[in-house]
Amino acid sequence: MNNMSIQEIVAAIKNKQPEIKTVYFVGCGASMSDLFPAKYFLENNAKKLRTSIYTANNFNYSTPAAVDNTSVVITCSLSGGTPETVAATKLARKLGAHVISITNKAGSPLDVEAEYCILHGFYESYGAKMEKPARALELACELLNEYEGYAHYDDMHVGLAKITDLINAAVPMFRPVAKKFAEENYNAPILYVPDDGNAVVKRNHLPFRRILPRTI
């Protein structure tokens, strides 16, 4: 594991590769969902950098031809042990890409296989659960600013610094509402989450009883 900050990681990549053409986001399940805000941010703000997102095995078995030393591949797994994501990390490095992993666990296979690693919190509080997508978004912002410039760079950092405390402060207010919703819908076999386009990170339909303990 390296102890580099996000700014240091991106600066190191820029020093080795002055031109980056593509940023790929790779993960599975919830970790893939947590990468969507960063992908959406680059997609809507970058003028030159291209971006796309892949499930890990899609990346492994239908690898984009453009993955090379002009690519940054960002892989994400909470445990750092998701086999498909670890394999994607190895593959991306083999193809010459600059690979950054995002995980909660230092020393995990994802940490070991990536060129750079960003560690995040998760279990400490409700707010800490936002660290994974927040670190991915911060990384996307840093890449954009380093390679193209980003007018709202400082504002982004101010906002990201407030997220954890804001969520933790809101938890007492929303816990009773969440508990009531969970109890009233406990027997619902499926919970559908409606969405509209890119405004929501991923469409999900989940057995409600599976998420009940986390809801309350």
What is the meaning of each model-derived region?
Residues 18-149, 159, 213:
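Glycine-rich phosphate-binding loops that contact phosphosugars or nucleotide phosphates
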Residues 1-21, 118, 124-128, 135-216:
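Active-site phosphate/pyrophosphate-binding segments
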